[in-house]
Amino acid sequence: MTTEIMQISLSHNPADARWGEKALISTNDQGVTIHLTSHDQLGGIQRAARKIDGQGIKQVKLAGEGWGLEQSWAFWQGFRGPKGQRSVVWAELPANEKTELEQRLKIIDWVRDTINAPAEDLGPEQLAKNAIDLLCAVSCDAVSYRITKGEDLREQNYAGIYTVGRGSDRAPVLLALDYNPTGNPDAPVMACLVGKGITFDSGGYSLKQSAFMDSMKSDMGGAATLTGALALAAARGLKERVKLYLCCADNMVSGNAFKLGDIIRYRNGKTVEIMNTDAEGRLVLADGLIDASEQNAPLIIDAATLTGAAKTALGNDYHALFSFDDELAQALLNSAHSEHELFWRLPLAEFHRSQLPSNFAELNNVAGGAYSAGASTAAAFLSHFVKNYQQGWLHIDCSATYRKSAVDQWSAGATGLGVRTVANLLLAQAKQ
């Protein structure tokens, strides 16, 4: 691996034919040139950065014209990897763009590092504390919080988080964080964010195969994404009150783990029969959504690596979006477009809410055998815990959070996708 700094420049001209038809990069004695000849120029820069990293080049300088904020960020998204050190000498940017780049590097890299962390190093309580540390590093004066853990969850009737997490030696945790930059303790809450923080998911007694378990350190991706989104919105100047709920637990097998046929009784009166212990994310989110609904905020967003069905539909390129609120769903899609992130809305209809039949409880935690729209029925399950589910609620199934192996645009591991979109939406809602 070379230790010299490699100069990287941009060109809108095609590479010399000797580099091959439609070559993305070429080299000369001045360094590496990225040739932007396709309509997706940011994607081209990101793919080129992966190629450069793959050649063992770890120290670079972005030189010449064309390196704006988005071009610089696209390069870093592709250049960054989960192991080894990399350094970039950034091109000169206007002060506001430089600040934005620095905030993204701090916050979105935190999200990626947190999701990539081994489960052994990141339990439920550590995830909650790390989230607090990030938000305090951005705007500590505006942050207050409460951590509820272990038996206290049972005593306070957080039945979902407690039930899922009780099978682990590491106690389950609910983080309730209040971002209130107004200084007024009676200020209305503009938005509530509810994140799934399963720090390892074995599947419980509905045990996963190794091929499906090996990436389950990333099952807290929703919690990390929403933490990063709130931090980035705060860094961008969010002046409205937002509450963050992280529902954190391990889903493990033990003599104390929950079992098929168990019934969970939630604080809102709903009862849920467990027919699959590997459908645990919705069980912990339900507690957070009940709390969020009690705030009467006009906006509730939950995010979770919830279903394999969403990945089957969209792969790892798009996050799946569900909502009964067409206007709000479009607002998020507009934010995603502004931030160059990919979201796709999947169906969620009133009839999905009745596709969770149980013989012994009001709801089943998985859909009946006749209903195969797994991502939609998972979203429908969550809607039963949102007081006004038809308006002001968005569910994000984080299918683009993590990649088990590298592709031409991304290294293996976490992507950080979704952070910018949710931050953008929070700021847009604050202006209304």
UniProtKB/Swiss-Prot annotation:
Localization, UniProt: Cytoplasm
One example GO MF annotation: metalloaminopeptidase activity
Enzyme Commission designation: 3.4.11.23
Binding locations of Mn(2+) 1: 201, 278, 280
Disulfide topology: none
Active-site residues annotated for this sequence: 208, 282
Domain of life: Bacteria
Single GO biological process annotation from the record: proteolysis
Obligatory cofactor(s): Mn(2+)
Textual note on the cofactor: Binds 2 manganese ions per subunit.
Broadest EC class assigned to this enzyme: hydrolase
Predominant place of localization: cytoplasm
Residue numbers binding Mn(2+) 2: 196, 201, 219, 280
Gene Ontology cellular component terms for the protein in this record: cytoplasm
Record carries keyword Hydrolase: yes
Family stated for the protein in its record: Belongs to the peptidase M17 family.
Function: Probably plays an important role in intracellular peptide degradation.
Subunit structure: Homohexamer.
Name of the protein described by the UniProt record: Peptidase B
Source species of the chain: Yersinia pestis
Gene that this sequence comes from: pepB
